[in-house]
Amino acid sequence: MANIAHLIVSGLLAATVAHGQQYEGSSRSEDAFSYVQPRNTTILGQYGHSPAVLPSPNSTGSGGWQAAHTKARHFVSQLTLEEKADMVTGQPGPCVGNIVAIPRLGFNGLCLQDGPLAIRVADYASVFSAGVTAASTWDRDVLYERAFAMGQEFRAKGAHIALGPVAGPLGRSAYGGRNWEGFAADPYLTGVAMELSVKGYHDAGVQATPKHFIGNEQETQRNPIYNPNGTITDVLQEAVSSNIDDRTMHELYLWPFANAAHAKAAAFMCSYQRLNGSYACQNSKALNGLLKEELGFQGYVMSDWGGTHSGVASIESGLDMNMPGGLGPYGTIPQAGSFYGGNVTQGVKNGTIDEARVDDMIIRIMTPYYWLGQDKDFPSVDPSSADLNTFSPRSTWLRQFNLTGERNRDVRGDHAKIIRRQAAEATVLLKNEKNALPLKSPKSLAIFGNDAGEPTMGAVNQANFEFGTLAAGGGSGTGRFTYVVSPLEAIQSRAKQANTLVQYWMNNTDIATTDVTTLWVPAPPDACLVFLKTWAEEGEDREYLHVDYDGNDVVSSVASKCNNTIVVTHSSGINELPFADHPNVTAILAAHYPGQESGNSIVDVLYGDVNPSGRLPYTIARNGSEYNAPPTTEVTTTGAEDWQAWFNEKLEIDYRYFDAHNISVLYEFGFGLSYTTFNLSEINAEPLVESISSVPEQRPIQPGGNPALWENVYNVSVVVTNTGDVEGKAVPQLYVTFPDSTPAGTPPKQLRGFDKVALKPGQSQAASFQLMRRDLSYWDVVSQQWLIPEGEFVISVGFSSRDLREVVRVTPVSGST
């Protein structure tokens, strides 16, 4: 979804943006770009194949929702046809998405609010760390706690439905503009984060909405280009089509959404782009086939804002709720009509739409509402949200909303402490030489970089401003800050305790072109801290991977004169780091988007109050041109169907690609340093079942799919020891190498487990990893099921994807089985 400012720009300049981006420093030939149709698609299955799956399956309330399902059916039985149409059609109102109330039934409506790191359209609310930051903790407790705390704030502001968490984009491309909203460029780590986030939201009494389903891996041309001289639905060029083969769909992009379904997610949001030629929000193979049938999803599917492109076809294909309800770009013109709304009423009356299908749409919407107890004592919508909602200001409302509750509620509680602690734990220490960190009572510090200080445009909303620290990205996934603690503010506060001299310069242009020895007085500082940033936002993909505002030149200028240069990046994700090997750059920390406690969290790490335990949720290549799978950013023809993104890299994204092609990297997936050291020993794999067959037992589908896939079949344990001098947290990671009998195209190794273990110096503790059947299975495109291949699996445990220290081999299925 887009905020209103970006909506206007996108609507007017879509063609310019779509054709204007190039990749800096790239020497790729045309054949390397993803819009070229691959010549050989036989290995992993057919491309562009989305067979119709009709009708849309009815919900059953399975997975423990039966009582709520019964209440939902009773509710639907009392509705008029017009009320049924209202229940599946959004209306402009106080929240970014609204379902109107039905007072005669005691139903107060539904409030849907962004987003994945905060309740965006609200004041006096916290702004948490971004998804990529949370994933960098590799900590299950953090992932759950973050979602639970956010859910508390959503509920206190009267929001029934949180529009998050994010598994799409997964991170296919390093340039993805919204990668920071998601978690990791890996389906397993993202899947764990999705499952725990859904549980956290739900335990707080708020509906989770995993998004964007599915194949939403670029921003460029995510929506069609409309004819400015035509009707409101007259399209010049369709949205880009993500063309994904069957095996890749299951093993990469569907995998984390399966975790979300397994956690009994209330809703799913379908994505803007086309999938194998059909818009994702009317792709019956994806919505009916994959989600509702294969994964047994019992909740409802809502469109992304303006992602609905038809009425009857979308309803039949599995779209249950049209948001925000109107026509036009991003669905923001309700006065022009709706694909749903009155057309639902008319379609039922003339027999075009089966009323039983409409009933199931509403049952799916109301079942999680009752399951979470939102029909009892749920807070009213904070009236101030209506004043802040530029997406649907009051002048656009077609219905009246009863906003009588407390205004300007402060819902933050003690969440600042949580945000600070989590952001510190997420910080990834990439380099630390000459014992540069932690800082040891420095007498003098020099601070450089336009990311160090206060946001000069105010802290309320993040934007790509030149001066001021960057704590979140842009678009609907951002937050409305009450305050941001800048690095400079936090360092100055800490420095006062030790009478440390702090000097600072925040004009990158001046720093990059000045002899910095002329800046510091009276002597060289003990350490030079350089703060760099990289902006990313919804609606556009990144054009380059280096840091913004001449950041590399800033580092070069400082490091040429300061032999203890410490670099901190606040970034959406992947950056080229050409200064990593500079001898005077003694330390590098990746802090990503840390949220409102940005400065405090980095100071905790710099001074050693927190031992960094963050690990990379992606790979940092030596050169940006080495990444595969760039987004499609240029189409030279004007045909309606010309925007195609061929996912011909198949399963080879991020570390899987670099491993498959034996490419050296700067910092590998899962990498991160500590102020202490760790070791592993005594690996062991214990089978948890007497025998394992290649084919899973066929059981009634539950949320998440066949329950047999979620059963643990092995327990792998390893002893972790702190071999250093200070307390710290180790992150042992388990990777699986599949047997040679697995079909071609299988990555050399895949993450299938991780743990986080706090250890005092000299302490040892066992870490354990539960391997499920699905962890040892591949998707067979012929039999259309998950199979465990015959032969020997290699299970490796280490501290990153390329630091594997303990190995054990298991053979779940032998050739004679």
UniProtKB/Swiss-Prot annotation:
UniProt-listed InterPro entries: Cellulose_deg_GH3, Fn3-like, Glyco_hydro_3_C, Glyco_hydro_3_C_sf, Glyco_hydro_3_N, Glyco_hydro_3_N_sf, Glycoside_hydrolase_SF, Ig-like_fold
Main location: secreted
EC number per UniProt: 3.2.1.21
Pathway it works in: Glycan metabolism; cellulose degradation
GO molecular function terms noted in the UniProt entry: beta-glucosidase activity
GO cellular component: extracellular region
GO biological process: cellulose catabolic process
Secretion signal, residue range per the UniProt entry: 1-20
Compartments where found: Secreted
Residues forming the catalytic site: 304
Glycosylation sites: 40, 58, 229, 276, 343, 350, 402, 507, 563, 584, 623, 662, 679, 715
Catalysed reactions listed for this entry: Hydrolysis of terminal, non-reducing beta-D-glucosyl residues with release of beta-D-glucose
Keywords for this protein: Carbohydrate metabolism, Cellulose degradation, Glycoprotein, Glycosidase, Hydrolase, Polysaccharide degradation, Secreted, Signal
Main function: Beta-glucosidases are one of a number of cellulolytic enzymes involved in the degradation of cellulosic biomass. Catalyzes the last step releasing glucose from the inhibitory cellobiose.
UniProt similarity note: Belongs to the glycosyl hydrolase 3 family.
UniProt-recorded name of the protein: Probable beta-glucosidase G
Species whose genome carries this gene: Aspergillus terreus (strain NIH 2624 / FGSC A1156)
Gene field: bglG
